[in-house]
């Protein structure tokens, strides 16, 4: 693969993200990493785009230089959003997404693959950001779900405490709503 792109929220970067990002950087000459929901900060997006960018850099920068971070705002308009992403990322050999809606939007523009078809089985980690945020909100172990450097950053920067104060109760309440 030459140019690969993806857009995720990275809230926070977890071990599943790390496995995907490392695999893409190993297999691609250039990886364009979209920081989705860059214009949102709420219970589903509790970390700023700059904070998410720092998490990705902590994971990738010690080993790779073939990646670029791109801010991708939400537009609340799928067709406009896909056109924006295409404009920001340009031509790609591959676009990667786990999100069915994003897959539908991007398939007319790119060859699209699910991360599960790219990450080798021995690296696959079944974690999502919702699980990490729920554990943070409950005060349970979340550190084992994220790369060590990310855990240290989240704690040292006071981001876990801030998340718990600002969005902890809302995160827990979301579990109760079907």
Model-derived features: positions:
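Nucleotidyltransferase catalytic core that binds NTPs
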Residues: 1-178
């Amino acid at each position: 693969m030459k140019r690969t792109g993806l857009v995720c929220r990275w809230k926070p970067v977890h071990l599943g993200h790390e496995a995907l990002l490392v695999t893409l950087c190993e297999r691609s000459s250039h990886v364009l990493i979209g920081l989705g929901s860059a214009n949102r900060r709420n219970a589903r997006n509790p970390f700023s785009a700059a904070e998410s960018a720092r998490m990705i850099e902590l994971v990738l920068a010690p080993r790779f230089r073939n990646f670029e971070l791109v801010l991708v705002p939400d537009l609340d308009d799928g067709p406009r959003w896909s056109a924006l992403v295409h404009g920001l990322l340009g031509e790609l050999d591959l676009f990667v997404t786990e999100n069915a809606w994003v897959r539908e939007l991007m398939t007319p523009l790119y060859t699209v693959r699910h991360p599960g078809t790219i990450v080798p089985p021995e690296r696959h980690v079944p974690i999502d950001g919702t699980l990490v945020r729920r554990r943070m909100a409950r005060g349970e172990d979340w550190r084992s779900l994220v790369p060590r450097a990310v855990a240290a950053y989240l704690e040292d920067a006071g981001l876990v405490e801030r998340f718990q104060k600002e969005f902890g109760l809302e995160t827990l309440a979301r579990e109760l709503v079907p």
